[in-house]
């Protein structure tokens, strides 16, 4: 468990991120509310964040209550037998990438693989999902990879909203010696911000306003 007062560097959270998927990770923070962004702390890891309510400046009736609940939560997760609910006996785990525009094909692939004894875990290609998938491949979670959506790579080239990926995207399966199928799903567009904030170059292209915050622009 890590505490994260707003003015203290995040080294302790970095240590928490080093733990593999499934190990309970809990962060109590003074900034876990409002407009604070947590991507720099959690990145691709399964970290639970709890607001401290009061400032972390010693123990009192408020901070004791918060810390107690956090400690009990971590202890309960550590003592639970997660495998009873997470492991599907006899199923071979396979990682798959997908996004909205490739959902129909992805669902058919999932149905086919499940009929043949595989358990498919899908990762949303939003700039975090792809690297979360790569990290878990490197942790040895999966036995194969169906990379149906490479949208994040194109978004990285044009600095789209889903382009915050690491250099080892597409490389983990090969590094682990796993079978991998790659398809250029959703590689033909980038996800940008609101229409009225697009650059002149982007405005001259075909586009679809996905919602008020996101615009899909043809590459």
Q: Where are these predicted regions, by residue range?
A:
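A glycine- and small/hydrophobic-rich beta-loop-beta segment
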Residues: 147-219
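Glycine-rich phosphate/diphosphate-binding loop of Rossmann-like nucleotide-binding domains
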Residues: 94-127, 138
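Generic beta-sheet signal
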Residues: 26-30, 50-52, 147-148, 183
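Cap/lid and interdomain-hinge subdomains that line or gate substrate/regulatory clefts
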Residues: 35-101
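N-terminal glycine-rich phosphate/adenylate-binding segment common to multiple enzyme folds
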Residues: 1-31
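Short acidic loop-to-helix transition motifs that present clustered carboxylates
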Residues: 32-35, 125-131
């Amino acid at each position: 468990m890590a505490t994260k007062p707003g003015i203290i560097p995040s080294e302790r959270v970095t240590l928490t991120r080093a733990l593999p998927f499934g190990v309970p990770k809990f962060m109590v923070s003074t900034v876990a509310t409002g407009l604070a962004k947590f991507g720099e702390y959690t990145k691709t890891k399964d970290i639970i964040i709890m607001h401290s309510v009061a400032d972390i400046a010693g123990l009192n009736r408020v901070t004791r209550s918060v810390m107690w609940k956090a400690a009990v939560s971590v202890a309960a997760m550590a003592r639970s037998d997660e495998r009873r609910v997470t492991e599907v006996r006899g199923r071979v785990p396979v990682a798959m990438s997908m996004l909205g525009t490739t959902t129909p094909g992805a669902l058919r692939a999932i149905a086919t693989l499940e009929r043949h004894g595989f358990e498919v875990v899908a990762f949303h290609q939003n700039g975090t999902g792809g690297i979360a998938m790569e990290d878990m491949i490197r942790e040895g979670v999966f036995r194969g990879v169906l990379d149906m959506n490479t949208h994040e790579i194109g978004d990285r080239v044009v600095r789209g909203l889903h382009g915050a990926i690491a250099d080892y995207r597409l490389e983990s399966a090969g590094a682990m010696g796993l079978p991998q199928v790659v398809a250029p799903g959703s590689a033909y567009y980038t996800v940008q911000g609101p229409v009225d904030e697009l650059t002149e170059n982007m405005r001259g292209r075909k586009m679809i306003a996905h919602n008020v915050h996101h615009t899909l622009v043809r590459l």
